[in-house]
Amino acid sequence: MKFPKRYAIVLLTFMCTNVCYIERVGFSIAYTVAADAVGTNQANKGMILSMFYYGYVLSQIPGGWAAQRLGGRLVLLLSFVLWSSICAVVPLDPNRVILLVLSRLLVGVAQGLIFPSIHTVLAQWVPPQERSRSVSLTTSGMYLGAACGMLLLPSLVKNMGPQSVFSVEAMLGVAWLLIWFKFASDPPRTDLPKVASKDKMKVQTGGIMAPRTVKIPWARILFSLPIWAIVVNNFTFHYALYVLMNWLPTYFKLGLQLSLQDMGFSKMLPYLNMFLFSNIGGVLADHLITRKILSVTKTRKLLNTVGFVVSAIALMALPLFRTPSGAIFCSSVSLGFLALGRAGFAVNHMDVAPKFAGIVMGISNTAGTLAGIVGVGLTGRILEAAKASNMDLTSSESWRTVFFVPGYLCIFSSFIFLIFSTGEKIFE
């Protein structure tokens, strides 16, 4: 039996997000070690860690536009060429602040093109009844990549130094772009001359036949309440994710006096849980929809609400647990249920605007990236303020605000999605 092309595309996009998150987690691990070795303070660490997101936010909407016009395949190739080259040539020296700032900005710009392009590709290739699990599988690559990075890269840093992480990331990026170049292709075009070809394309693309020159309804998109429900939840999801991804190593080291190198397999559990729950959410959503157990709207709202509310509870419990096992448990539950919630808001843009999925994803991910800028930088300042107030960073009080802020945001965002979201197509 021939392997359907759309399955190959989904598998390749899964590998894409996997490699990208190995890079992101790898930088936070390697830079934290290098910065601590030279005595960099927490505010400056937060500034460098957040630079990626300043670049990332600049290319979200242009990335969606470029994918719509040029095709997601080409834009993904260009992205990987740029960020892999930077990883290959830039030295990881915390004292060379300007070079680090510029390099992280450029890596952010390059990777900001990725998710709008991926969602454009998936909206074109994947039929509606397979979208939840396809998007969930693709995005679960992020979490598996983060899990692999947390498991393997601390040992690499310990044995070969922080710079070795950059080299490995560059090699992984080049390997993926070569595979993508060879096996990926743009979807069938809409300008095929025969009706039979058009009918075939409808089956392959789920009826999404908008040509690349279609007029984009910018005003309607920007003033749509269901779109804003997606945007708000994307912001909150990424605020919580990026705070944990960038500051969890510091929390283990300073808050719990525990080295990542000594944690073994347990340090990858939060991200492995995200991988599992993301796919569970996608399969469950498709099951509820295809079996007509719930409508698309009710399915999205149910999974989004359960995911965000449970995550909020676990986030606010995190600083109260003063043992490594308690912290791992809370962070695993929080991130796992956040990933489950992606079967709500993160697929919803393909429900409401399938022809403009890349554009809506670009807008939504812009908000998510702003969350990275705000959350990662703000956390560094919160910790510095705690130190200035003579609070001990080993105490739970100094970390309470760090984890309570995303917890409250999760509760607020779940209500916004319940009130304003829909699973119906609103943009033809």
UniProtKB/Swiss-Prot annotation:
This is Probable anion transporter 6. Residues 1-22 form the signal peptide. Belongs to the major facilitator superfamily. Sodium/anion cotransporter (TC 2.A.1.14) family. The gene is PHT4;6. One of its GO terms (molecular function) is phosphate transmembrane transporter activity. InterPro entries: MFS, MFS_dom, MFS_Na/Anion_cotransporter, MFS_trans_sf, SLC17A9-like. It is a multi-pass membrane protein. Its main location: membrane. Keywords: Cell membrane, Ion transport, Membrane, Signal, Transmembrane, Transmembrane helix, Transport. The keyword Cell cycle does not apply. It comes from Oryza sativa subsp. japonica (Rice). PANTHER family: ANION TRANSPORTER 5-RELATED, SOLUTE CARRIER FAMILY 17. PROSITE patterns: MFS. GO terms for cellular component: plasma membrane. It is found in: Cell membrane. It holds the Pfam family MFS_1. The chain crosses the membrane at residues 47-67, 74-94, 98-118, 137-157, 164-184, 221-241, 269-289, 301-321, 327-347, 356-376, 401-421. GO terms for biological process: monoatomic ion transport. Probable anion transporter. The keyword ATP-binding does not apply.
